[in-house]
Structures are given as structure tokens and as C-alpha cells.
Amino acid sequence: MSQKIVILGSGESGVGAALLSKAKGYDTFVSDSSMITEAFIAELQQAGIAFEQGVHSEEKILSAQLIVKSPGIPEKAPIMKLIRSKAIEVISEIEFAYRHIHPGAKFIAITGSNGKTTTTLLTHHILAQLGYSVGLGGNIGTSLARQIIHEKKDVYVLELSSFQLDDMYTFKADVAVLLNITPDHLDRYEYKFENYTASKFRIFQNLTPADYYITYSEDSVIESYKKDHPVDARYVPVSLKQLYSAGAYSDEKTIQIHALDDTVVTCNTEEFPLQGKHNYINIMAALNAAVSIGADIHKSIASIKSFRNAPHRLEFVGSIYGVKFVNDSKATNVDSVWYALDSMKTPVVLIVGGVDKGNDYSQIEALVKEKVHTVVALGKDNSKVLSGFASMVSEIKEAHSMVEAIRIAHDSAKKGDTVLLSPACASFDLFKNYEDRGTQFRNLVIELAG
């Protein structure tokens, strides 16, 4: 009798896990308390996988020997409390896929509160340009479980969220990257920053002295936590202050990086499509990761020039009468806005707001005072933004739709200014998600420019 596996959640990771489970011959059942999309229903039916939607049937779920949980389901969900009370093993889709991975596959795993998507995409781009057989997965693109059913890659570059890391146990990366840790998603961690930090550090679990780990060496949270939780692997630092005996350093004009033969290679940052200190950190991390699995440093550097970042991340949309419009809708916390403002070279009209996560806007006060002359508060309830920025800028205005926000921002901007959408907040008060918010911004700007 085959092992019974229940998949909780029917997004890309859940359906991918279900398809892999079925392919491996397990008794597979999918349960989602929400409605499953038509496309995913068709896939499940074609594969002969039983499922339910709009409900969690306790009897069916609690009869499982193994549960693969989608990352969006919190531990406080009633069904999870029941599962935990029965001591049924719960793992993530990544962990499930890892347990069925083909021998010899290597993993580059990347996490961080900010920058992980860009760094993951860039690392994948470098290796693909250099001819590696490389897959992209995790919190981005196609689920790892789906990928390994029919296709075997030599290397997988994975973006991993804290939610995914929480349910990973035997997974081991060959190269593990932790970019930074700033407060985020604390509602999932009992509002304790130390719990969130511990979750991020799971990226280093099971590393051996033959493996590599990469961090931004000036991140005080990472450095402090490392003192009590040392990592047993080869350290490859990324720094904006100095060049260590390994890793990479940027003075913002250049990047210096150790090659495999330990020679130091220097390149000019002006050659890269990604600009700003935060992006130099991302570039150095990606280069270090590629070099750590054997990539040629010179070819890796050259490949970056053809990279195009994912949408909604400091995406230049266009100019209207000399005013630049930049879409940074993915900036859903204060730290992301700090990085965005730090990269700005012109005076800024800042569109900010949405569903506040308990933000402390004083963290960006110095940069706002230096670079921003007008704030446009965009949201249903703008009270926290209005009070948070009132003492920082000469002008602060309210908008309750993207159309209104762009009109106000454009009217407030002078030739040579930049209108920056970098909200620092979640989007679901006025928009479906951050992509919807960014897409509306982009489309309206293009329409105005036309």
C-alpha cells in the first residue's frame, strides 16, 4: 500500500508537489480551503489526482502519513493546529522535491528580506548565459517539484522565503546566500524578530565545510546572530567597506571580486544595468555564487550586461516632459524604500502608502529629507503615512487611486525630477497585489506619455 500524501494548498507549489507525488506513485490528495483555479483543476484532473476546494476535510487530511504544506498557510490556521496535535510530518514543496532529486544536482539557495528575487534571477541569468544546465525555482517561477518530474538540471537556483525555509529539514544547499535581515512578516513569527531571524538562518542548515555561504558582511543582524550560531562552511563575504581574503567588495564605482584562482578581478559598476548600492550587493552575491560552483569570473561579469530585472523593482517606466517615472511597487517595507531612495540621483516625488505593517518611517527620515520634496500618500487610510512623513517634507498630499496619485505626482514634479512609486506597504487595500499596483502605475504612465 503506497504512502498517503496530502497537499495543503493548490497554488503553483501545491500543484507541483501533487504532480510529483503522483508521478512517484504515492496516494495523493489535494485540499484547499479556497477555490482552485480552473487551470490547476484541469491539471489535477488530467493527472488523476483527487482534490477538494473550499474546505479542509479533517478526516481525509489527518489520515495522511506526510503533508506538504504551501508556504502561505500559517501555523495558527485551525487545520495546522489539528495536524500538529496528531504529530503528522509536515514539509514544504522544496523539501519534498529535494527528497526526490536526481543524484549530482547542485543547489544555490538565496534568501533575504530584500533583494532575493533580483539576486536569484541574476544568478540564474549568469549561469544560463555561460551554458550551464540550470533551473530556476522556489518562490519564483515554476515550482521545483514540477521541474524535476521530467527534466534533470545540473544546477538549481532557488529563491527561498522564510515561510518555505520553516518546513525544510533535510535540504542542503551547495551555495547558500543570505543578503540581509530586516523586520518583515512578523505576524507569522509571534511578532518576535528573533524568530524571523532564526527562520532566515535555516538557509544554512546542513552545510558542510565543502559548501559555501555568502552574506552581506555589514548587515548587523546577520553578524550578531552568526556569533552564537556559527556556520560550518566556507565564507564568501560581500562588502561595501573592504576587500576580504575571499568574496567581493564595491566602492560603488567598481567591484573587486576574487576569482577561483584567488586573483582579484575589477570591473566598473557603470557597465551594469542595475544601479545603486543595494544592487551592487545583489550583483556581488550573484557573482560570488556563480564563481563558487566553478563559473568563469570574466564571462560571469560580461553576462550581467544583458540582464533585465523582474518588473516592479526600480523599473524605469518612461519620462513625461522631463519627469522620470520609476515603478518600485515590490518595495513593501521601509528597508526597500531606503534602498530605492539611496539609488536616486534626482529630486524625488515619492508615492507611498497602502496597508501599513507597523512601519517606522524614521528609519528613512535622513534620505527623505535629502532627496524627497513631495510625498503622495496612496491608500484607503493614509493617516499613518501622513503623520509619519509630516515633518520630513515640504509637501504631502493624499490620493485614493493610482490615477489620482500619478496626476498629483506629475503636477508636483519639476523637469528633471523622478516620480518614484515605492510604497513601503502591502497593496491589498486598493489593489489585488503589488503586481497589480505596479502594472496600473506602468500602464497609466505609458498612456500619459503616449
UniProtKB/Swiss-Prot annotation:
Q: What is its EC number?
A: 6.3.2.9
Please report the name of this protein according to its UniProt entry. UDP-N-acetylmuramoylalanine--D-glutamate ligase
**What job does this protein perform?**
Cell wall formation. Catalyzes the addition of glutamate to the nucleotide precursor UDP-N-acetylmuramoyl-L-alanine (UMA).
Q: Does Transmembrane helix show up as a keyword for this record?
A: no
HAMAP family assigned = MurD (MF_00639)
Q: What GO molecular functions are on record for this protein?
A: ATP binding; UDP-N-acetylmuramoylalanine-D-glutamate ligase activity
Q: What are the UniProt keywords, alphabetically?
A: ATP-binding, Cell cycle, Cell division, Cell shape, Cell wall biogenesis/degradation, Cytoplasm, Ligase, Nucleotide-binding, Peptidoglycan synthesis
**Which InterPro entries does the record cross-reference, listed alphabetically?**
Mur-like_cat_sf, Mur_ligase_C, Mur_ligase_C_dom_sf, Mur_ligase_cen, MurD
Record's catalysed reaction(s):
UDP-N-acetyl-alpha-D-muramoyl-L-alanine + D-glutamate + ATP = UDP-N-acetyl-alpha-D-muramoyl-L-alanyl-D-glutamate + ADP + phosphate + H(+)
This entry carries the following GO cellular component terms, namely: cytoplasm
Keyword Cytoplasm appears in the UniProt entry:
yes
Which SUPFAM superfamilies does the entry link to?
MurCD N-terminal domain (SSF51984), MurD-like peptide ligases, catalytic domain (SSF53623), MurD-like peptide ligases, peptide-binding domain (SSF53244)
Places the protein is found = Cytoplasm
**Quick one: a GO biological-process term for this protein?**
peptidoglycan biosynthetic process
The similarity annotation says:
Belongs to the MurCDEF family.
Residue positions annotated to bind ATP are: G112, S113, N114, G115, K116, T117, T118
Pathway noted in the entry: Cell wall biogenesis; peptidoglycan biosynthesis
